[in-house]
């Protein structure tokens, strides 16, 4: 809702969807501590943010307790701080699961690299229209690749 000062992007919805998936598949809401798998009881979701100095991963804490608008506002604020080089270390630590989006630069597929010590990361590619033909007509169907890297 831009009138309320919040631009809602697909990332906010993907964060919420990831929380729902992590609740259903808690094995992926974990991190590695040496040889031990540590299961998390909270949902801190990181997202890759491109900065002039490279990628950083700010973390939306307790994403399960926030709505889409609140997540949209927070990801926007964290991304702005990242671009300005003003993120604090605690704003980039403690994630359980991360999202890496390549859509902004036009990629339709890639393999995201896990943000250690997390055990999984979701890639968000750019959507596109795929031509599909049947015996009667040609149509274009929306496609979106969501690669998931697991450890």
Across the structure, where does each feature detected by a protein language model lie?
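C-terminal catalytic/motor cores of large multi-domain enzyme assemblies
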Residues: 1-151
